[in-house]
Regions:
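N-terminal basic, low-complexity leaders that serve as flexible interaction/assembly modules and, when applicable
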Residues: 2-82, 445
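Active-site acidic/histidine proton-transfer and metal-coordination neighborhood
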Residues: 10-13, 43-46, 94-101, 109-110, ...
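Catalytic domains of carbohydrate-active enzymes, especially glycoside hydrolases
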Residues: 50-57, 87-117
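N-terminal small/glycine-rich loop or linker at the start of catalytic domains
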Residues: 53-85, 155-170, 202-209
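Non-cysteine beta-strand/loop elements that form the S-adenosyl-L-methionine
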Residues: 58-62, 150-156, 199-201, 302-313, ...
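Active-site beta-loop-alpha junctions enriched in small/polar residues
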Residues: 62-64, 115-118, 155-158, 203-205, ...
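Gly/Pro-rich active-site loop or hairpin
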Residues: 69-94, 213-219, 253-264, 286-374
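Flexible, acidic glycine-rich loops studded with aromatic residues
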Residues: 303, 322-451
Length: 451
């Protein structure tokens, strides 16, 4: 899905809520303008592609336009003058137009949403779908007007009390059926809006206690659910990418999609690896006890590195803080790994992050995204420079040189077994001496490029 050029057209917003703010543009590293990019130059070419093509930035609807700042200890704080707080269709449609006004100013080429982010739930499934269609009409108009595309969409299968025991893994078969209808509608929505993908996140697919759980049966139901989704995707001709997004916990104590390895194991078990890739999130990796680098390498080794949810977490806290990324060391490693494995096809850098409760003004939405886009752009430049100089790859190549010839090559080709290896070592006597892993030396190299 190539990035579309912006189209001329007048927004239908009744009041320009962002008209007093400038369109965000690139001014370079020396700029002190908080309303400008210092590193993200969408037209700059790196490794044969523009920054915009490499990064494929996406704004999420849920955190950016639905987060109120409320938490378990206090009410909402966000100032959103365009939102009257009602669940009316008129308010939902207005909110959608305002969202595209914001994205036009920011300059991101993609966006993403859950079904319930954009339209309220009705009293019946029929009414719910009607509400969604009414807002999708506005979304389609705005996408056509601006050229902003849908990176991926998804369904909220965790918020309503009906999903307390799960959706596809619920002990209630009717809830499974209800979830299936939601995903059916979601896939039809993805097709209608030409989405690049569709994401499954199992926030309630797991357990709180094993005392009341038939794990084997639940996993089999989840596998069957995904096979139904694959079948319907083919039936309607949707050619977007399916993603699973790993997360170990929150809201459920243990989620079945706990990390990249667990997701890959599940996909292999049910013969679905060819149909899915992973949408990896930094904060979820942290909660799973991993780095994002680890999760990306795990997915990429299986050919399943699909898309990225860009955020970060607070290592001092044990929950999903969904902060905007700000660490150059982190983004440099992320972009190095992404470039190493060929970059995105239909995925992108999706800002699944929200401003802090204390950052409550509309201006903060801009500052957060500008910072996130800049730190990823600079991470891309650092990664490309390291690749050009082969700063890490040459060291790794030499480190594994014993596998390129001799007994190492014989092992990799499957030409020897235990008996042959025993004979080899009896003749040689002792293994060749090990060499230093040089971790500190390599960390210094990365810091040299960053600084």
């Amino acid at each position: 899905m190539a990035i579309k050029k912006k189209r001329a057209g007048k927004a239908k917003t009744t009041k320009g809520y962002f008209s007093k703010y400038p369109k965000i543009s690139y001014e370079g590293p020396k700029s002190k303008n908080p309303w400008a990019f210092k590193w993200y130059n969408p037209e700059e070419v790196i490794e044969g592609k523009t920054m915009a093509e490499h990064l494929r930035f996406s704004v999420v609807y849920w955190h950016t336009f639905r987060a109120t700042g409320a938490d378990q200890f206090g009410m909402g704080t966000m100032l959103r003058p365009w939102d009257d707080g009602s669940d009316s269709i008129a308010n939902a449609q207005k909110r959608m137009r305002v969202a595209f006004e914001f994205m036009e100013k920011l300059g991101n080429p993609f966006w993403a949403f859950h079904d319930r982010d954009i339209a309220p739930e009705g009293k019946t499934l029929k009414e719910t779908n009607k509400n969604l269609d009414a807002v999708l009409k506005v979304a389609k108009e705005e996408m056509d007007r601006t050229g902003i595309q849908l990176l991926w969409t998804t369904c909220n299968l965790f918020g309503n009390p009906r999903f307390m025991h799960g959706a596809a893994t619920s002990c209630n078969a009717d809830v499974f059926a209800f979830a299936a209808d939601k995903v059916k509608k979601g896939l039809e929505t993805a097709l209608k809006l030409n989405a690049g993908g569709f994401t499954f996140w199992g926030g309630r697919e797991g357990y709180t206690t094993l005392l009341n759980t038939d794990m084997k049966r639940e996993l089999e139901h989840l596998g069957r659910f995904f096979k139904m989704a694959v079948a319907y995707k083919k039936e309607i001709g949707f050619d977007g990418q399916f993603y699973i997004e790993p997360k170990p916990k929150e809201p459920t104590k243990h989620q079945y999609d706990s990390d990249a390895a667990a997701c890959l194991n599940f996909l292999r078990q049910f013969g679905l690896l060819k149909d899915f890739k992973l949408n990896l999130e930094t904060n979820h990796a942290i909660l799973a006890g991993h780095t994002m680098h680890h999760e990306m390498e795990t997915a990429a080794a299986a050919g399943a590195l699909g898309s990225l949810d860009a955020n970060t977490g607070d290592p001092m806290l044990g929950w999903d803080t969904d902060q905007f990324p700000s660490s150059l060391y982190e983004t440099a490693n992320i972009m190095y790994t992404l470039l190493k494995y060929g970059g995105f096809t239909k995925g992108g850098v999706n800002f699944d992050a929200h401003v802090r409760r204390e950052s409550f003004t509309p201006e903060d939405l801009f500052f957060a995204h500008i910072g996130g886009m800049d730190v990823f752009a600079r991470g891309l430049k650092v990664a490309a420079a390291m690749r050009k100089d082969k700063a890490l790859s040459e060291f790794i190549k030499k480190r594994y040189a014993s596998w390129d010839s001799g007994i190492g090559a014989e092992i990799e080709k499957g030409k020897v077994g235990f008996k042959e290896l025993e004979a080899y070592m009896l003749k040689k006597g002792n293994p060749a001496a090990n060499e230093s892993g040089r971790q500190e030396y390599l960390e210094n190299i990365i810091n040299d490029y960053i600084m």
